[in-house]
Amino acid sequence: MLLRTKALIRSGGSIAKYAAANPSCFILQRRGLRREFGPKYTAKINEAEENWQARAEAIKKGKKQNTWDLFEERGYVKDTAGTKEHIAELMRTRRIGAYVGIDPTAPSLHVGHLLPLMPLFWMYLEGYKAFTLIGGSTAKIGDPTGRLKSRDHLSSSDATMNMTKIHYQLKKLWENVDTQMRARGYEADWARKRGIVNNNHWWNKQPMLEVLRRVGHALRIGPMLSRDTVKNKMTQGDGVSFAEFTYPIMQGWDWFELFYQQGVQMQIGGSDQYGNIISGLEVVKAARESEPDPQERKYVTPKTALDECVGFTVPLLTDSSGAKFGKSAGNAIWLDPYQTSVFDFYGYFVRRSDQEVENLLKLFTFMPISEITKTMEEHIKDPSKRVAQHTLAREVVTLVHGKQEASAAEDQHRMMYTGQMTIPQVSRAKDAATGGDQYKTISDQPVTLNNAPRIDMILPESLIMGKSIGRILYAAGLASSTTEGHKLAAAQGCYVGGAHRAGGENVTMNPDLISFMPVKLWFPGETQRYLINGNLLILRKGKHNVRVIQMVSDVEYAASGQTYPGQSFTGAVRKLNEIMKNLKEKKLTPEEAKNAVNELQKSSQEKQQGQQIIFPEEKSRQKKDMETKLKQEMIASVKTIDGMMDEKPSVRGDGVKKQTQDDRDPYKW
């Protein structure tokens, strides 16, 4: 969400003087919104500034490392917008803000996104302000950089799906960075800030005419046409559209909005983003000079070189074979555990060569250089143990998926390659999860970003449009039954995503502004009002248990082979009757029918495992009797094939099978 920051300072004292000298460090809110800080807050700001100046003095005397020097030491810097000396001095003296922008053109981040994010995470650890920008609006245009063919147009529902999933991936990364910060012993710093911002927040309100009026005159087509990426697309590709020409302007305006609202003076980009960063600097400069409000112009207009914006790009990484880093057999290594399993993700880093592993430890971990040196010394003693590779894999998986998943994945790999027979499963067994198992939570643990179930799913139109919200919550795995789903909705214990537009009955949710409001009991026909783009429903239970549900036709859902909890005609009794029918019609042999029954029983027993039954402690004898009976029922075999053939189901006069006591018993077929 867009973080609201503090307004201009009109009060007296040292803060006002510092604000006048350093306008970018005290952030403007929307025009005309100014307020004074109270004495306690003023004292906190003064203390934070004094601490930062003490830090700057320690860096000057060589007692502490400059963060820019850390970047160069670890290999994060490729091209710079601004001299290295200027950037180093800026980072020494100012608690600047920095950002990395990501367009949600795919449903997940991949390993390649981690490289520009790592210096941003380091800045956060060192006490700066760090922001990740989701390009909800710029993704609709598509960055032409490095492409010969224009990106395929994203539908509104796909864009919303991608935007939501990437938002939660970034939240997960930031929480894991916080965990690493505490584990590495970084001191608490009140002025340290981080945030996730979506450029939909201003592009949905900002007229393009106003943007062009303020910055259009400062940009020239010639320099844009002279870039290699544009030349290649025009001569070897499908040409550059007018929309793609506007992309650098939109990206530059994003930077200005972040500067205006959060004091962001630095942009960090991938190896191919240098041209966009240079264009962004021109847009920010033009926007600052064309500020229409005279009162605010004196604050946004740069007074010294340290008020100017800067940027840099990270290098392009390739592995020992020359392939682009983050690819395996031509496929991206995704951060989504359901697209690249935790086991495979860990394995990708374990397979790195000895020649590249030290560099990767510097780039993708928060390990101090001294610790990396010791790891490499231990690795050299016996390279076959792959000590450095396992350290790299463990650190990266901890950052992306959490410590518990990293430990489990490490155990899996070590036991697999040491010949042990028993291989432990990762905590949520994401690697083996299929169908409805991907949406289950751990019964005895709270849902966190690291153990949350899969977000995206499909459900049939007949359910979404024709059933109650309680049934939908049950089908989505957010409730254990339809009854619980109704109770959740009645108590407003779950939420629907989107910004509802006031108006007619059929006016649907706004796909560009994803916020959440409590779910209420509504008629099945009203669900349509909460769909985004007519086919996307976003639900949330708790803080992190989210479902982005794509509504598909019943035919398409049936073709997918999936089922959902509470789906009609999928019960065990009905499946058994179907086996009996196929047997009598000789579509199955007795042996095939027996195997089908055994599979059905096995599936039922697997579903029942892990569902803990709690017995009253005061009735110890009753508890023992019930536990014994339950165990007997769960391991009892079904009737023999001959018995099934001889038995005739009870049938009413209308030909419909009556429900017998065995049908009602959940532990019998």
UniProtKB/Swiss-Prot annotation:
GO terms for biological process: Group I intron splicing; mRNA processing; positive regulation of RNA splicing; RNA folding; tRNA aminoacylation; tyrosyl-tRNA aminoacylation. Residues 596-627, 641-669 are annotated as: Disordered. Coiled coil: none annotated. L-tyrosine binds at residues 99, 143, 247, 251, 254, 273. It is an enzyme of class 6 (ligase). A motif ('HIGH' region) lies at residues 104-113. It holds the Pfam family TyrRSs_C. Residues 33-75 are annotated as: Involved in splicing. It is found in: Mitochondrion matrix. Its EC number is 6.1.1.1. GO terms for cellular component: cytosol; mitochondrial matrix; mitochondrion. Transmembrane segments: none annotated. A motif ('KMSKS' region) lies at residues 324-328. It catalyses: tRNA(Tyr) + L-tyrosine + ATP = L-tyrosyl-tRNA(Tyr) + AMP + diphosphate + H(+). Residues 601-612 have a biased composition (Low complexity). One of its GO terms (molecular function) is RNA binding. CDD domains: TyrRS_core. Residues 1-32 form a transit peptide. Keywords: Aminoacyl-tRNA synthetase, ATP-binding, Ligase, Mitochondrion, mRNA processing, Nucleotide-binding, Protein biosynthesis, Transit peptide. ATP binds at residues 103, 327. Its main location: mitochondrion. Belongs to the class-I aminoacyl-tRNA synthetase family. Catalyzes the attachment of tyrosine to tRNA(Tyr) in a two-step reaction: tyrosine is first activated by ATP to form Tyr-AMP and then transferred to the acceptor end of tRNA(Tyr). Has both an aminoacyl-tRNA synthetase activity and is involved in the splicing of group I introns. It acts in intron splicing by stabilizing the catalytically active structure of the intron. This is Tyrosine--tRNA ligase, mitochondrial. The lineage of its organism: Eukaryota, Fungi, Dikarya, Ascomycota, Pezizomycotina.
